[in-house]
A protein has these predicted regions:
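Sec-dependent N-terminal signal peptides
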Residues: 2-10
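Intrinsically disordered, low-complexity proline-rich regions
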Residues: 12-14
Length: 268
């Protein structure tokens, strides 16, 4: 069950409107770099929903971002879905309730449970790293691109098996509390740049739900590494930001890049 919950927790939800706070403690989330003679590609691991209680867009991360000519995210959420009041139902994605998500009601239920657990810890996509970066790029007039189309992500989610959420109120409450605690632990690890804290979770996911792991991590990380390898053939500076879980474990983007003979270095 928890494998599907975690899968939902570290994928890209629709972003909200960022709220800027001052005098927050510094965080140092992991930043990597790939480069050759005329190309620099930064690889940043994001946390899609944060509590806004740390300042992470600073130091090496901000310097790398400001020196980049393009931001590349996992996907670009359509503008009409970025509105705070946009309904988060299948209709909001241009589909009927009984459509591409018809076979994944359980997965949608799981996703709602994950969002609820995150909210209980004050986490919101309004503070998420992807949202902050996208808004900063828009403000700076920086081009923004996606590694995947939004339609591809919807199709992927529609194929993922979900977990049957407990119907008993007491059991559901314990499940929510456990998930909220885990999300808080992962956020803390992200804040301190401890990317390998995500690896045991990924190992558990691969063991319990190999199909989810294959679709969401192994295959996508391979495609993204291939994209980076191709992009190195063009000059320029690019800031690539993907979920931190994709930079951890034996099938990380860095590991996939190594299969192309491409070395990844930690910046911070």
């Amino acid at each position: 069950m928890f494998a599907a919950l975690i899968a939902a927790a570290i994928t890209t939800p629709p972003p909200g409107v960022p709220v800027v706070q001052a005098s927050l403690p510094n965080a140092r989330p992991a930043l990597y770099v790939v480069n050759d003679e005329d190309t620099i590609i930064y690889l940043f691991g994001t946390f899609h929903a944060l509590d806004g209680k740390s300042e992470w867009f600073n130091d090496e991360v901000r310097t790398a971002f400001r020196g980049s000519q393009e931001l590349v995210l996992e996907t670009l959420v359509p503008e009409h879905l970025k509105k705070p009041r946009a309904p988060r139902q299948p209709q909001a994605f241009g589909m009927q309730p009984v459509g591409r998500f018809a076979g994944s009601a359980s997965f949608l239920s799981t996703s709602k449970a994950v969002m609820s657990a995150g909210r209980s810890k004050g986490m919101s996509t309004a503070h998420g790293a992807d949202t902050v970066l996208r808004d900063a790029a828009d403000d700076a007039g920086m081009p923004v691109a996606g590694l995947e189309t939004f339609e591809f992500q919807l199709g992927m989610f529609s194929k993922l098996p979900g977990a049957d959420m407990p119907k008993d109120a007491a059991v559901a409450a314990r499940t929510n509390a456990a998930l909220a605690g885990l999300m808080a632990q992962l956020q803390a690890a992200w804040n301190r740049g401890d990317i390998e804290q995500f690896a045991p979770m990924l190992d558990q996911m691969e063991t319990r739900s190999p199909e989810i792991y294959r679709m969401m991590f192994d295959e996508r990380n391979g495609r993204w590494a291939q994209w980076i390898a191709r992009r190195l053939q063009q000059p320029g500076v690019v800031f690539v930001a993907v979920g931190a879980g994709h930079l951890a474990g034996k099938d990380s983007v860095q590991h996939k890049l190594g299969q192309y003979g491409i070395r990844t270095a930690r910046v911070n």
